[in-house]
């Protein structure tokens, strides 16, 4: 599924990385524990999180995450956005909760990081 479609499903507003809206995404994961993200997430996946710290971006960069969507209208600082822009990492904000975000994407056919539906 294209990143653009995912953002539409989540009613998300892009913050940066608009050039990557045609990115094809196969899997999605949700976590507020960055140690879990580092423990073997799928390259190019979408990360749903409620954390907005700069550590989220650093972790996403190391793990090869394709895009980060902040849930519950959580807005990162300009410093966080600038770091993501420097690595061409798309960021977006969704008004949906983590639960609703996961449910919507599952309903639309997205698979989890383990490939299960």
Give, region by region, the residue ranges found by the protein language model.
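N-terminal, charge-rich interaction modules
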Residues: 1-21
């Amino acid at each position: 599924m294209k990143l653009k479609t995912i953002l539409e499903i989540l009613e998300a507003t892009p913050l940066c990385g608009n050039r990557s809206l045609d990115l094809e995404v196969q899997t999605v994961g949700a976590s507020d524990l960055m140690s879990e993200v580092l423990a073997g997430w799928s390259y190019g996946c979408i990360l749903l999180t409620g954390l907005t710290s700069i550590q989220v971006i650093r972790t996403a960069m190391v793990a090869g995450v394709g895009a980060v969507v902040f849930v519950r209208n959580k807005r990162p600082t300009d410093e966080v956005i600038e770091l993501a822009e420097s690595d061409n990492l798309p960021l977006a904000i969704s008004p949906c909760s983590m639960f609703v975000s996961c449910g919507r994407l599952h309903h639309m056919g997205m698979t989890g990081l383990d490939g299960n539906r």
